[in-house]
């Protein structure tokens, strides 16, 4: 029988159907149409440990709750912010720390979060920046009084909006914005002050998968302490000291 920490052979294993959206470098397609990215690698590694075969399904992020409720997916695993909505799902332990940040054009006069007052900002709909800037984030903070909050179903439209000058700023996960900035024809810079510091986890429907959550948490703990998580985030150019969760501090 398999000992804890050993990886299962990917033969006749039960599927874990994972809902994702395109969110490079976390989840995206390679040239052959395969799902790749930080969260994909982590999910595949965890599933090998706990005895599941991962099946990644792209979902409309704004419809994620409905898809989960209908049973079309087992969980949502795509850099999903748990901060402020801890009671809406059954969550795993957090596996990564993330900053929600704001990016502006390099020559913009905007230098801080306070400077966003009376400005136009773009976000992906149903994300944490959408919740924060619309005042429904579930966390206490002073929200800028925007001229407009423009919500897009696809993150690529958000970037197109700032490129074309339709908005003054965009907000999202720092690692996602930085990935876009690598290839953007328009030079952007990230404001030094974070919009919100958050943690991400894997979300399941309440009271449906307690044993799976327990086993994923055990795998997270193992991968943190054997160095896998640090090596994984480092391979994406991220500092493990900033991104890897210290589980001792979460207890």
Q: Which residue stretches match the model-derived regions?
A:
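Periplasmic-binding protein-like
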Residues: 20-22, 97-104, 178, 182-221, ...
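Acidic, polar ligand-binding/catalytic clefts
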Residues: 44, 48, 53-115, 189-194
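A ligand-binding cleft/hinge motif common to bilobed small-molecule-binding domains
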Residues: 63-66, 79-88, 132-135, 160-197
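Extended ligand-binding regions for polar small-molecule ligands
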Residues: 40-49, 107-110, 114-128, 178, ...
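Short helix-initiation/N-cap motifs at beta->coil->alpha
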Residues: 40, 55-66, 147-164, 198
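A conserved helix-loop-strand patch within extracytoplasmic ligand-binding domains
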Residues: 52, 60, 92-145, 149, ...
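Short glycine-rich His-centered loop
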Residues: 13-37
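Ligand-binding cleft/hinge of the Venus flytrap
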Residues: 28-31, 43-52, 129-152, 180-185, ...
């Amino acid at each position: 029988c398999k000992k804890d920490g050993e990886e299962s052979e990917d033969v006749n294993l039960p599927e874990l159907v994972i809902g994702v959206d395109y969110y490079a470098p976390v989840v995206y397609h390679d040239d052959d149409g395969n799902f790749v990215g930080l969260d994909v690698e982590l999910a595949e590694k965890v599933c090998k440990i706990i005895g599941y075969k991962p099946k990644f399904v792209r979902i409309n992020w704004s419809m994620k709750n409905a898809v989960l409720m209908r049973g079309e997916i087992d969980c949502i695993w795509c850099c999903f912010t748990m901060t402020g909505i801890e009671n809406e799902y059954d969550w795993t332990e957090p596996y990564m720390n993330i900053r929600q940040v704001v990016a502006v054009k390099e020559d913009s006069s905007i230098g801080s979060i306070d400077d966003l007052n009376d400005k136009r900002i773009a976000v992906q709909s149903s994300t944490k920046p959408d919740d924060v800037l619309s005042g429904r984030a579930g966390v206490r903070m002073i929200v800028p009084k925007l001229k407009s909050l423009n919500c897009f179903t696809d993150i690529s439209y958000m970037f197109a909006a700032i490129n074309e000058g339709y908005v003054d700023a965009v907000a999202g996960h720092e690692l996602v914005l930085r990935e876009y900035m690598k290839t953007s024809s328009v030079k952007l810079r990230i404001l030094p002050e974070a919009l919100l510091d958050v943690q991400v986890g894997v979300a399941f429907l309440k009271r449906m998968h307690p044993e799976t959550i327990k086993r994923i948490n055990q795998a997270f703990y193992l991968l943190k302490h054997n160095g896998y998580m640090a090596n994984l985030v480092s391979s994406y150019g991220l500092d493990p000291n900033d991104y890897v969760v210290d589980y001792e501090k979460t207890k």
